[in-house]
Swiss-Prot record:
Transmembrane spans: none
Native species: Soybean mosaic virus (strain G2) (SMV)
Alphabetic keyword roster: Host cell junction, Host-virus interaction, Hydrolase, Inhibition of host innate immune response by virus, Protease, Serine protease, Suppressor of RNA silencing, Transport, Viral immunoevasion, Viral movement protein
Protein name: P3N-PIPO polyprotein
Positions marked as site (Cleavage): 308-309, 765-766
Chain ranges of the Peptidase S30 domain: 168-308
Motif (Involved in virions binding and aphid transmission): 617-619
Gene3D superfamilies: Helper component proteinase
Length: 992
């Protein structure tokens, strides 16, 4: 039995023996199919191969170690010195190594190598066979004559003539190329095509059949064309001897010829030719009345011939395998094995084919033409009707791995907008209106009416129109009353929220604990990247203080060590309070003039703030629930003895971990990969609550079941403008406000632009004064070159904060910080170096203008260029997000100001810009005043030296020229601006 591998299926093709012709097609029996039987030999071979792989890996590691050891110059020098150092004994009786220097060791090594080479030469016979008996050979000093040449100074050697050699033709005879091509084809099995005339082509290849290498012609009946004479002997007889020249024939009887042998060529060396045709060559076509038929001969009745082309099943699988192997997945992460039978593979292929291309027969041209002539809408209706007619089969197919995605793709692509009546009503209401807002509504409605058939350009246009409408509506929002705090009440709910995922018996074990299942396995993507392990043996003291740039909070993790003394245990229940803030406008959130209570701080019945209490720690739990008693969920049991704490700036990951509880198990992989690869890189460290809520909304779009997921406890620190997401280690610091939002659906409301709230701009565990600190660091470092070099090396985006003031840009240009930045980053990152180049060009333009508003306008116009470059720069430095926010503010401000100017309004912030510029100038002057005394002395000494030197060179009458030259030198020393030079007034010239 022979096995043909087609994709991932094995089909058994029996070597049938046909003694006579038959009109019936031989069916493939079940016993003839390939069966996969595990064998002990295969297991041993697998183990042997795995062992060989490990041995090869070990030898490769040793080889790389030896190469690294030999290439280490320091180690080789130390080995050479120690090799030639002598061992000496000390007074205490110890033995020590008397180390030589490297030069002495090298000379000894060279002497040993030279002596060894001399010994080898002596043993190999490389010496002169001479005898010396006390007599030294001396050169005679007597002149014995020599050769004399007669060449003059004009002599030149005669150039040699090169003989021209004619290239011999490699083609010794006309058929040389043909023989070479056929020789290659017989070895490789490539297809050779002979063009015998206009529109007449003959295809030949060499195949292995019946233990021999035989030429095989491609005959018309193999492609479904039946003619009386398939090959013209008159047009092919010239090539037939050369084709048979490279064939290897064996003794083949007529009874051995069967299906699949059509096109085989035999010459007079075979009995098939001598017994079945009068021609010198025989090409198998089939049988007629038990006798083989030659394809080179004319046949009258073609219906009597039983053609020996491959059976339909083999032809089908040959075409299927050819296309299947051409279209493999681009991702290869495993080694394929045979896990399903041929019948199961055929069912899967047929199900996918009939789902996308439903026909009665794939070989029927009318079935294909029927689908070809359908319009796109008719084709979608055809697929939906076909799927509806075979609903029972689809219920069975969904159990096959991956088939539910096929069904989902078909349903999504064929879905239509069922609310056409609503869309038509919108058309009726907006018809004949030409205002901007009505036209925007019409564009959005057109895209919604088309449903899945909408094009990408139409979707983009609808999104832009929706954004424009949203911005217009936001600008027309009106504020509500001012005395809202007097009547504001936001009591804590007395009832705990019910989470269906924690109440379902199918998701609980026998102890009533939540079973993570596949969710726990995929949660490693969180713990491996954004959590760090807490090692109890090292103590909990280093985890107690949870710092952020604006303050700090103490965790209650130290309470995990429980004292046995009652008095000390009661002391562990006391927290450390921060300054308790009352309810202010920053504690509330409003939309359309109404309170959004889930986005507000919790209060008591009398309207006073509800302050947080001591949160006791637990070891390995996820604590959720903001109202009522908290719920403790065991962390995934992948590492039973490990405790984890979120890394600095990533405490918001506890929110996504709580959402994972409600994610379906089969979608847990997609959820965790989206959080790791898409959400967290965008949020980064210390994101705002606005960004966290937006990220939660994006996740709920793909996983709607997470909307009712319960949140961990969130404390609000108004003093630091920070929100703390409490994990299982609790909080020893008390006195914070408590956020009322208890579910993800309530937290998403922070993502609304219409929501009027200060808390949505709070950092989740982060810092809000980052921009001010970056500006301060830049201003204080302008006149300190060493600090500026550290900034350029570690955090170069801080220099973009100089865009807030033209004066800062000019001073940085004078100190040549931009040039230094280009030198540092031109070999590391071209995008960062490009930022410094553009900053230098912008400063030259700004310095040439004296009007502050025009200078700020130039900076705003360049912001978009900076933003496009910043997108390609590394995002690791801490000031990346701050610089990006500053550029975004300039870009958005420029766009809004342009819109105001177009509508006839005037920007009235010029006074504010001038006041802000004066404050920055005072800061710069203070920085200049704090220059070290050493620098001042250096400048004074330089000025005095220049004055005294030039005073000796000029007489008293050239005092004016001396002063002019001195001012020029003084400008260079004091780094005056090259565009707008100023006269040096720091020095009083002595009278000559």
């Amino acid at each position: 039995m022979a096995t043909i591998m087609i994709g991932s299926m094995a089909i058994s093709v029996p070597n049938t023996h046909v003694s006579r012709a038959s009109n019936s097609v031989m069916p493939v029996q079940a016993v003839q199919m390939a069966k996969q039987v595990p064998s002990a030999r295969g297991v041993l071979y697998t183990l042997k191969r795995e062992g060989s792989t490990q041995v090869i890996k070990h030898e490769e590691a040793l080889r790389k170690f030896q190469e690294a050891f030999d290439q280490d110059v320091g180690i080789q020098r130390r080995l050479l010195v120690n090799k030639h150092s002598s061992i000496q004994s000390t007074k205490e009786g110890w033995f020590d190594l008397a180390s030589l220097n490297f030069r002495a060791g090298s000379s000894k090594e060279a002497a040993i190598a030279r002596r060894k080479q001399e010994e080898e030469d002596f043993l190999n016979g490389k010496y002169e066979q001479q005898f010396y008996a006390g007599v030294s050979a001396t050169k005679s000093m007597k002149f014995e004559g020599g050769s004399v040449g007669f060449r003059t100074k004009y002599w030149r050697p005669t150039p040699k003539k090169t003989k021209e050699r004619r290239a011999t033709s490699q083609c010794r005879k006309p058929t040389y190329v043909l023989e070479e091509v056929l020789s290659i084809a017989s070895k490789s099995g490539k297809l050779v095509e002979f063009i015998t005339g206009k529109g007449k082509r003959v295809k030949v290849c060499y195949v292995r059949k019946h233990g021999a290498i035989l030429p095989k012609f491609s005959l018309p009946h193999e492609e479904g064309k039946y003619i009386h004479q398939e090959l013209q002997y008159a047009s092919t007889y010239e090539f037939l001897p050369y084709i048979c020249m490279f064939a290897k024939y064996k003794s083949i009887n007529a009874d051995d010829i069967t299906y699949g042998d059509s096109g085989l060529l035999f010459d007079e060396r075979s009995s098939l030719t001598t017994n079945h045709t009068k021609l010198p060559y025989f090409v198998v076509r089939g049988r007629r009345n038990g006798k083989l038929v030659n394809a080179l001969e004319v046949v009258e009745n073609m219906e009597d011939i039983q053609h020996y082309s491959q059976n339909p099943e083999a032809q089908f699988f040959r075409g299927w395998k050819k296309v299947f192997d051409k279209m493999p997945p681009h991702v290869e992460n495993h080694e394929c094995t045979i896990d399903f039978t041929n019948e199961q593979c055929g069912e899967l292929a047929a199900a996918i084919s009939q789902s996308i291309f439903p026909v009665k027969k794939l070989s029927c041209k009318q079935c294909r033409q029927h689908i070809k002539h359908l319009s796109w809408e008719e084709y979608k209706q055809f697929l939906l009707a076909h799927m509806g007619c075979h609903g029972a089969e689809w219920e069975t197919f969904q159990e096959i791995d991956g088939m539910r995605y096929v069904k989902r793709v078909i349903e999504t692509s064929t879905a239509e907008n069922a609310s056409l009546q609503t869309s038509l009503e919108i058309v009726r209401l907006t018809q004949n209106y030409k205002s901007t807002h009505m036209l925007q509504i019409q564009d959005i409605n057109k895209a919604l009416m088309k449903g899945p058939s909408v094009t990408q350009s139409e979707l983009e246009q609808a999104s832009k129109q929706l954004l424009a409408m949203t911005q217009w509506w936001k600008n027309h929002m009106a504020l509500t009353d001012e005395d809202a705090l007097k009547v504001f009440r936001n009591k804590r709910s007395s009832k705990a929220l019910l989470n269906p995922s924690l109440l379902c018996d199918n998701q609980l074990d026998k102890n009533g604990n939540f079973v993570w299942g596949e969710r726990g396995r995929h949660s490693k993507r969180f713990f491996a990247n954004y959590f760090e392990e807490v090692v109890p043996s090292e103590g909990y003291s280093k985890y107690v203080i949870r710092t952020n740039p604006n303050g700090q909070r103490e965790l209650a993790i130290g309470s995990l060590i429980v004292p046995l003394d009652f008095e000390r245990a009661r002391m562990a229940l006391q927290g450390k309070s921060v300054t308790r803030e009352p309810i202010t406008m920053s504690c509330i959130s409003r939309q359309d003039g109404n309170f959004v209570y889930p986005c507000c701080c919790v209060t008591h019945d009398d309207g006073k703030a509800f302050y947080s209490e001591l949160k006791s720690p637990t070891k390995r739990h996820l604590v959720i629930g903001t109202s009522g008693d908290p719920k403790y969920i065991d962390l995934p049991a992948t590492d039973a003895d490990r405790m984890y704490i979120a890394k600095e700036g990533f405490c918001y990951l506890n929110i996504f971990l709580a959402m994972l509880v409600n994610v379906n198990e089969d979608e847990a992989k997609d959820f965790t990969k989206m959080v790791r690869d898409v959400i967290v890189p965008r949020l980064g460290k210390w994101p705002t609550m606005l960004d966290v809520a937006t990220a939660a909304y994006m996740l709920t779009v793909f996983h709607p079941e997470t909307r009712n997921a319960e949140l961990p406890r969130i404390l609000v620190d108004h003093a630091c403008q920070t929100m703390h997401v409490i994990d299982s280690f609790g909080s020893l610091t008390v006195g914070y406000h408590v956020l009322k939002a208890g579910t993800v659906n309530q937290l998403i409301q922070f993502a609304s632009n219409d929501l009027q709230s200060e808390m949505k701009f709070y950092r989740v565990g982060g810092e809000v004064q980052q921009r001010m600190k970056c500006e301060t660091a830049l201003i204080t470092s302008i006149f300190k070159p060493k600090r500026m070099i550290q900034i350029l090396e570690n955090d170069p985006y801080i220099l973009l904060m100089g865009l807030v003031s033209p004066s800062i840009l000019i001073h940085m240009y004078r100190m040549k910080h931009f040039e230094k930045g280009v030198e540092l980053w031109i070999s590391k990152e071209h995008s960062v170096a490009k930022i410094f180049i553009i900053l230098g060009q912008l400063t030259k333009r700004v310095a040439a203008n004296d009007v502050l508003l025009e200078q700020l306008e130039m900076i705003s116009e360049t912001s978009e260029r900076f933003m496009s470059i910043l997108e390609d720069c590394p995002q690791a430095p801490h000031s990346y997000k701050t610089a990006k926010d500053l550029l975004t503010m300039y870009i958005e401000g420029k766009a809004s100001n342009n819109q105001l100017v177009e509508n006839g309004f005037v920007d009235m912030n010029d006074k504010l810009y001038m006041a802000y510029e004066k404050n920055l100038l005072r800061s710069l002057e203070a920085g200049m005043a704090r220059i070290k005394l050493v620098g001042k002395i250096f400048y004074n000494m330089a000025i005095e030296k220049i004055c005294s030197t030039y005073g000796e060179m000029f007489d008293k009458e050239s005092c004016r020229r001396k002063q002019r030259i001195f001012r020029k030198l003084c400008e260079c020393v004091l780094h005056e601006c090259p565009v707008t030079p100023k006269k040096c007034k720091k020095y009083t010239f002595p009278k000559m």
